[in-house]
């Protein structure tokens, strides 16, 4: 009798799973014939099962690919996803502004949220709706101008530590020495987010070369995410497949376990400090006036003065630790790497910047002193424009909607359209890098690295709905990068210290360098894929006359 009951349950479960899979398959197969996007122009699909997805994921120069599509099909068109389904591609500034300002109606796709939750938990980057607003509201105080001003000392200190790290390398091998700079930059920015985010020194830039446990976890994580894999996509679409054991998931789980263990240690230690200070004298309380991210979150969480709706649960606090460990150092380290690459391609720009940096009478500038350097500002802006660390973002419509456009398009029936109708579930691709390098917005020299352009930018650029500097690198709206001020000032501090201290040349022919996107756009060398992402430079100490 028990056997019969168990068999019936298993059969019922199998039938339910089969029904879900069948419904999903039928929905996908009929989608191209009923899609509201079917009459948009667009590039022909290179593959029925994969559409344009593999091409977009593996493109060496995604900006050039997107710009070629825009030149041929306009700023708004359709492209192909899985199994012939249609997706919306738009670089139209009015459309993008609308999507960003209606974040309740346009969420990250299921596959993105599944991947982010798998790695980060339910942190700020992976949640939507009310939960996102709650987390963002509590975290905003950590990233205001006053807070970043107080953290600049950490940025400068760790930038000097990186200079010392590289000088040590040069003393061993002579000058100019070949140094893979991405590794050092990643360690430096990890140390920064440790101190500024959690008041914890990871000491990644240790000269004895001992591997840092957290850095090793990151390396495992990003190696696991490398490449175009079908299974994670299927797991996002068909949740029962997430139960399947696979090597990639096991490696990610192992790396995440390390990140979360360190996160719990940080939270436990900080909680103990806050509780001890609460029952101690004023002197002890003054020691906890730190406004690092973790202190602010835990003070908010432990305070009885705040209404329940403004507090984060312990689970939500824990989710922010890996979120900011990854987001707080990966984007900045790669942005500075691309900045150094750009400076190797134009020695005049490099020297002009160096001359300005040496005009500052201190090697330990404040945030205000960094912000008063116009050419440094221009170089940082141009780096973030031309080499945006995150080259694109994607959203899914949560309801049927109509999106108005700045630039009309001609549909495949020859009719002019000034809006796009989307249906619930439609994917929308926003090409950050293509908008940053659009010739229609920036002029014919849009692909050139030209800091002088910031002396007078075109009027059309004012329509770009980014939170910073009329570009999309930090997005806009409710999901704009909460740490953009943090990132910009940290980047300035790094460039200030490095370019004052060293001269840089590319160690390989420029044609060998390429970009590899694993969430973040990283430099890599053709023919050296086994060495992972890297930026080898020839470095020598700058000797001022």
From Swiss-Prot:
Give this protein's Gene Ontology molecular function annotations: heme binding; iron ion binding; monooxygenase activity; oxidoreductase activity, acting on paired donors, with incorporation or reduction of molecular oxygen
Q: Which cofactor does it need?
A: heme
What EC numbers are recorded for this enzyme?
A: 1.-.-.-
Task: Tell me what topology the record assigns in the membrane.
Answer: Single-pass membrane protein
ATP-binding keyword on record:
no
* Compartment(s): Membrane
| Positions annotated as glycosylated | 301, 436
User: What is the official name of this protein in its record?
Assistant: Cytochrome P450 monooxygenase 197
**Annotated binding of heme, by residue:** 481
Give the signal peptide as a residue range, or say none if absent.
none
- Enzyme class, spelled out: oxidoreductase
Keywords, ordered alphabetically: Glycoprotein, Heme, Iron, Membrane, Metal-binding, Monooxygenase, Oxidoreductase, Transmembrane, Transmembrane helix
Alphabetical GO CC annotations of the entry are: membrane
Transmembrane regions listed in the UniProt entry:
9-29
Organism listed in the record = Postia placenta (strain ATCC 44394 / Madison 698-R)
Q: What does this protein do?
A: Cytochrome P450 monooxygenase that is able to use carbazole as a substrate for oxidation.
The family this protein is said to belong to: Belongs to the cytochrome P450 family.
- Pathway in which the depicted protein is active: Secondary metabolite biosynthesis
Q: Name the source's superkingdom.
A: Eukaryota
InterPro entries registered for this protein in UniProt: Cyt_P450, Cyt_P450_E_grp-IV, Cyt_P450_sf, Cytochrome_P450_monoxygenase
